[in-house]
Amino acid sequence: MSSLDELIQKARMLLSEGHSPGQIADELSLSMETVTWLLTQKKGDTAPKDVHIDWTVVSSNGHLLDGIASLMIERYYCAHPFESVEGQCPSLGSNAIVGIALSGVPLATLIAQKEQMKLAIYHPAKHSSGENPVGSISGNFSQVGGENAIIVDDVITSGRTMHEVVRYLRRHKATPLAIWVLFDKLGIKEVEGVPVYSVFTISRID
């Protein structure tokens, strides 16, 4: 069985278990367009150009996940060599971490714990139902009004969710300072003026 056949089977299995296309896209680290194709494609149809990322070896292991969270913090510090004050630790310049559900949440939680910051959770519109789905901040965690925030997720695929969360934060009087991701499939430097700090950039060579 080819890796494409396996992806098709996995996408259809997740759908049969009640996952929405948006949730399937997150589970497989694929774009919504690719997931739609996996679920509906007919034999001979051309597949969308995308890259499947499987990092479950890390994401399923608490110790490794903790190490990746530390790596994301260090990556930001390396890009911003803060002038140190004797006897004090450098500061991120932010007081809140916004984790994007689903896969951004454990990373954001670990980062917030390490940096002693507030933790907010964002549910993107693609996880909502109804005719006009909208994204929202969970009421069970920190709110974002008036906060300087760092946005955290595992993958940038199409960039739509990042645009969505940046606009949401600004509408709710928060200031997005940076976007941290493990994998960037677009190779972008910023989203609506907010700088992107990825650990890995994924490029497709056709």
From Swiss-Prot:
Disulfide bonds: none annotated. GO terms for molecular function: DNA binding; orotate phosphoribosyltransferase activity. Coiled coil: none annotated. The keyword DNA-binding applies. PROSITE patterns: PUR_PYR_PR_TRANSFER. Signal peptide: none annotated. Gene3D superfamilies: 3.40.50.2020. Keywords: DNA-binding, Transcription, Transcription regulation. The keyword DNA-binding applies. SUPFAM superfamilies: PRTase-like. CDD domains: PRTases_typeI (cd06223). It comes from the Archaea. GO terms for biological process: pyrimidine nucleobase biosynthetic process; regulation of gene expression; UMP biosynthetic process. PANTHER family: OROTATE PHOSPHORIBOSYLTRANSFERASE, PYRE-LIKE PROTEIN. Belongs to the purine/pyrimidine phosphoribosyltransferase family. GfcR subfamily. Contains an N-terminal DNA-binding winged helix-turn-helix domain and a C-terminal regulatory domain (or effector binding domain) resembling phosphoribosyltransferase (PRT) domain. This is Transcriptional regulator GfcR. It comes from Methanosphaerula palustris (strain ATCC BAA-1556 / DSM 19958 / E1-9c).
